[in-house]
């Protein structure tokens, strides 16, 4: 919530969870902290420096209040009882998925449904050009990993790049996938295009130093 609310002008986002139960758990947590973030932003409105600052804070507050997040998971038999065992209620989420065309809404950049919480659906073959941030909390490998990270890599007006936030640690799998699938017709694989962590940190420090001079 903290991260996405600071990136609020960048586009839509998707959280990939390990399973369906975790999707609903994360929805509940996001809902809790999103409401707190709204209150926090309302308090920020009391400390505006000037008209421009007031306008920016007001726009962000409106975005927070309008933004909708939703669970998108496939239906299964006896799912109500399954979720009850975890003290969770899938019914309101399932009703929303059935009554609304969430896929179309999510693809519409002007629609306030901005954060999708998924575990398997929408990871492949589902293009949302305005999707800018992908939060990964599920171990993915090879083709599925490549397809998933490609969700945030579509070209869109005003979108400079896609951002992958890795909570689970898929760097090793990403290196392997890029080496295997990122070499065109070379089936024997190749070198990983991902730099070493030490070198990347040094580059980041140097870039920060140059900007501060």
Q: Which residue ranges define each predicted feature?
A:
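Long, hydrophobic alpha-helical segments
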Residues: 154-213
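Hydrophobic alpha-helix feature that most strongly marks membrane-spanning transmembrane helices
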Residues: 5, 35, 107, 111, ...
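Switch/connector loops and helix/strand junctions flanking conserved nucleotide-binding motifs
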Residues: 23-25, 78-83, 126-127, 142-147, ...
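Cofactor-binding loop segments of dinucleotide-utilizing enzymes, especially the Rossmann-like FAD-
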Residues: 18, 74, 138, 167-169
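Conserved C-terminal RecA-like helicase domain
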Residues: 1-118
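Short secondary-structure boundary/capping segments
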Residues: 29-37, 83-90, 132-134, 149-152, ...
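Catalytic cores of large soluble enzymes that bind and process phosphate-bearing ligands
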Residues: 18, 22, 94, 98, ...
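A short beta-strand element within the Helicase C-terminal
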Residues: 114-118, 122-147, 162-166
């Amino acid at each position: 919530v903290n991260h996405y609310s600071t990136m609020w002008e960048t586009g839509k986002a998707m959280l990939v969870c390990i399973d369906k139960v975790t999707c609903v758990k994360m929805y509940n947590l996001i809902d809790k902290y999103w409401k707190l973030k709204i209150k926090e932003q309302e308090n920020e409105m009391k400390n505006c420096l000037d008209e421009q600052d007031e306008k920016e804070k007001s726009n962000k507050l409106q975005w927070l209040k309008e933004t909708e997040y939703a669970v998108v998971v496939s239906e299964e038999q006896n799912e109500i009882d399954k979720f009850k065992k975890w003290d969770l209620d899938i019914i309101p989420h399932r009703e929303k998925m059935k009554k609304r065309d969430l896929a179309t809404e999510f693809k519409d950049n002007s629609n306030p449904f901005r954060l999708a919480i998924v575990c398997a659906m929408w990871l492949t073959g589902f293009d949302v050009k305005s999707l800018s941030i992908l939060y990964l909390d599920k171990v993915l490998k090879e083709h599925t990993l490549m397809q998933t990270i490609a969700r945030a890599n579509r070209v869109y007006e005003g979108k400079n790049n896609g951002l992958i936030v890795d909570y689970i640690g898929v760097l090793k799998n990403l290196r392997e996938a890029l080496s295997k699938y990122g070499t065109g017709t070379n089936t024997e694989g190749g070198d990983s295009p991902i730099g070493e962590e030490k070198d990347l940190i040094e580059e980041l420090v140097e870039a920060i130093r140059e900007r501060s001079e």
